[in-house]
Amino acid sequence: CIRDRAFDPDDSNTFYIGTWFEGIYKISGTECVGHYTSLNSPLSKGWAMAVPNIVFDRDGNLWIAHAGDVGVSMLPKAKQSIDTDELKASDWYQFGYSEIKNNKYAKLLIPNHSTAKWVVYGDWPGSIFAFDDKGTYNTIADDRTKNIVSFMDQDNKTFTPNYYTCIEEDNNGQIWIGTSSGPIVITNPDHVFSDSFRCTRIKIARNDGTDNADYLLQNINITDIFVDGDNRKWIGTRESGLYLVSADGSEILNHFTAENSKLPSNHVTEVIVDPVTGVAYIGTTSGLAAYRSDAVQSSDDYSNVYAFPNPVRPDYEGWISVTGLMENSLVKITDTAGNLFFQGYSNGGQISWDGRDRSGNRVKTGVYLVFASSSGSSKQSGVVTKILVVN
């Protein structure tokens, strides 16, 4: 049974698979080229060879969270090329924190914007464990650590869910944590070891004429969180389907259920959004679903902008997407005479147009010019692509 996978940052053709009971497999192309077990790694035999999480850090080191007596281990980049028949357990660095031993539902986060690493202890009673190894991988004596069973929120209220389920860093460096009672946000991850450390429970106003508000997805059992190219959060749940919320969490943009969409089940196990196409792949207990969203990863310039479908044929009634844009681009679509038909800002690197003019009528046959500009860049802007519409 596959638990997790991670691609080698230096070789997209090579990836590692964590499993229940069978350790880690190293795959290159379509061939298995390595197998990490109790013979050549810190993994123990039996159920303790479960590896629920595999992560590469910025230096290319391979980190694993696993179910044995150690909890977290790291294989340095320099040792990853050693044949697994010759590798020894001593080639790994082991982080034997007692708080995260025997963590068969572990989730490990190595942030890009902050120092501390985070481990979700997914069993009961749940906790979040943060540690700063200070780069001294051969000892934990100088590490800073903190085990959090209960969080104090921004209003100095104690928050103690039964379970912590998932963890994800967003594009601004804030850390989102899923729990059995809704999500919480760590807005200042580097403050985790300070006495003033707090989490944020996002409030959504009821808009009923009062000052009352409800916590975002209060008491909903969160199973997974994914951050897309526009920093929006896709939040999977155990019983309530899939939510898409705004970047700051203040607005629920969409709620997909088995009743109102093609979601096979309301029990969502995992969500992944392709950063190039914007397609969200949703795993459920009853099968897989796919949904084309309008947010993809932004580009550094306008050199690879394209529209699809293109040409737009007479029988097509859906959205026309322009992708490959810079973040938060101002996009205008005109005809060759300069008449404006559409204007808007991109979600991440993509924007969608319904093929209609500003009065809601389908545009006539012709070539339409797509202009794009970014206020946060000095990159040259202008016509970035063209769309042919045929009626």
Regions found by a protein language model. Name each.
Residues T14-I17, Y25, N61-A65, A116-V120, ...:
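Conserved beta-propeller blade signature
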Residues D301-K332, Q350-W353, S378-S381:
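Glycine-centered coil/turn sites that cap beta-strands in beta-rich domains
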Residues L330-F341, Y368-V370:
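Short, glycine-anchored, charge-dense loop/turn motifs used at functional sites
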Residues A289-E317, L340, V390-N391:
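Residue-level detector of functionally pivotal "anchor" positions at catalytic/ligand-binding pockets or at interdomain
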Residues P183-I184, N266-D300:
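Blade-level signature of beta-propeller repeat domains, shared across WD40, Kelch, NHL, RCC1
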Residues R3-S12, S38-D59, Q94-S114, S150-N171, ...:
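Short coil-to-beta transitions that initiate beta-strands within beta-rich domains
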